[in-house]
Amino acid sequence: HTFTYTVTESGTAPGVTNDANTARKVSYIVTDDRAGHLSVKRDGGDGADFTFTNTYSVAPTDSSVTDQVTTVKRLTGRDLAAGEFTFDLLEDGVTVASGTNDASGNVTLSPIRYEAPGTHTYTLREACPNALGLYKGVTYDGTTYTVVTTVSDNGDGTLTATHKLEGTTESAGFTNKYHAMPTQVSIGAIKVLEGRELKKDEFSFKLVGEDVESTVTNDADGKISFDKFEYDEPGTYVYTISEVKGDEAGMTYDKSVFTATVNVVDDGEGNLKASVAYAKGDKSVEGIVFNN
């Protein structure tokens, strides 16, 4: 007589995919030898009666290094702007993640997808627009950090990524320095003499400002040129310019007092820019002219 049975698999386990064929049939033949004995033999021969093949796998996980490794951007010399600086994470020289800072200096890197357990060693650095490390008045920080990521199989079909800075450093910090290049301004005037020809160095003129005093003379063409002033900080600088009264008989000296106001601004790209405005009393003038 032949007996046929159906064997099924049931149950679930995290991360395990059961055999798509959930049922197996197996038959046994029972034989009577007419001598009081029964024998049983599986229909189909020797070997395993049946096999269920299940598959264990893990789901990929996305993880950003900066979720666990605090990365901070600092800028001295001016305010930091959101998205101003870029940071790269490299593995074997290839960029695998990048990101920027926010206005507070916090850096967020893009996530990396991990599909299997393992260990990854990364280099974290700031990206610089050129090899000099200097761009638009900003000196970039060339510091690099090593990040070691360990991806573990939790045994339930999931992966966990753990990111740690190598060494004793608790966080990755990058400090850039902003400094605008100085600018120079030339302040000059014109001397006009009526009644006779003007002579070189005939008249003297004084410029006075905060911690500044300079006296020069005219050239033969009437030009008056003070030394150039250099500025390394933004601000407003005010000077008064007047003619020094001489004692030549028959000469009427100009008693006018002019004001030169120099406004120095930082363009935010590493440059100081200056503009000069002239005034006589409370009236704006195009330039300074002394008439004798």
Give residue ranges: language-model regions.
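Solvent-exposed loop/turn and edge beta-strand elements of beta-rich ligand-binding domains
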Residues: 1-292
